[in-house]
Amino acid sequence: MKAPNPKTLQPRDYQVNETWLAYRINSAPINVDHKEIDLYVLQDAASMFLFGNVFAAAGTDFPEIMQVEKLLSSAHAKRDQWPIELLLPGNPGQDNSFVIAAGKHEVKVRGVPESQLSFYIKDTQEAYEDFLGSSEGDA
């Protein structure tokens, strides 16, 4: 694994399945059934493969632990391997559900400045916004 530096992280910085990323992709709350939610994704840093997503109440710092555990288990089932580390934007606390769930599988969790994850976040946000735009046009 290459040592990360303050620059924007890129897929070329990683090997497949050594590092996963978890982050919120919506820039504004999503209104579903009169409730505002945030959408979090789990992604492989090298391949950019999206393992899946979970929802959280808008304004909370992370999804519920059960959702995160299911998401991580589903990703593990697809790769039959745990990553070495999980990157989260910012400085996640020990109460963060991603920190707790990853720790159960001895996956190291590392907080990084959100700006270093911008390559991934922007790409996923653009795809998400394109999808929403095409879905709204079909309705």
List PLM regions with ranges.
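Secondary-structure boundary/capping micro-motif
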Residues: 1-139
